[in-house]
A protein has these predicted regions:
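Transmembrane helix boundary and interhelical junction motifs in multipass membrane proteins
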Residues: 23-52, 132-143, 152
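Membrane-interfacial helix-loop-helix
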Residues: 1-26, 56-135, 146-152, 158, ...
Length: 182
């Protein structure tokens, strides 16, 4: 029980009083979590605003963006790049070998790929999927790799998507707590 309390206290300090150490911790946590997909860390990090004493302000929003959301977005992009890379380079052999277990063939992938032309609205769709707070990133990263999305677009849109996802959660929780306090 004490270990759980200490964990909550450490996370709470990292969110409510961020410093260089907490930035590195958030970066490392998000990178590792994208590789292992253990925790819904977007929810865990944003729930720490429930313990906030001060009103949710522009200054706090800016601090959360700079010290929490951006490092988390960069870390998550680095972590999810491994899944993307495996799907990008091993997608066809993997689908041909294991696709029968999922009732999926390379022809199915080609049909799906023909619907995506590599235009701006494909990237908007990818970004929208990255914004959904409870959607696991593994399938989104794998599909982006299999469909051979540009690595530069993937990395940039993943950083933007994860950063905005975190800020959306902070905004909902922060403004929700402000409403409850009134």
């Amino acid at each position: 029980m004490e270990l759980a309390y200490n964990f909550v206290q450490v996370v709470q300090d990292a969110i409510l009083r961020p410093d260089f150490t907490s930035v590195l911790s958030i970066f490392f946590l998000s990178t590792v979590n994208e590789l292992t997909a253990v925790l819904p860390y977007t929810v865990i990090l944003s729930s720490q605003l429930l313990f906030i004493q001060d009103p949710f302000s522009v200054a706090m929003f800016t601090k959360l963006l700079l010290f929490i959301a951006i490092p988390m977005g960069i870390g998550a992009a680095i972590g999810s790049s491994l899944i993307y890379g495996l799907a990008y380079f091993g997608g066809k052999p993997g689908i041909e070998k294991f696709g029968k277990y999922f009732q999926l063939s390379w022809e199915d992938i080609k049909k799906m790929e023909s619907k995506f032309k590599g235009s701006w609205y494909d990237e908007i769709l990818f970004l929208a999927l990255r914004l959904v707070p409870l959607l696991p990133s593994f399938p989104v990263s794998a599909v982006a790799g299999i469909l051979r999305m540009s690595p530069v677009s993937y990395f940039i849109l993943t950083i933007i998507g994860f950063t905005l996802r975190m800020m959306i959660m902070f905004t909902f929780v922060g403004l929700g707590m402000g409403t409850l306090a009134q």
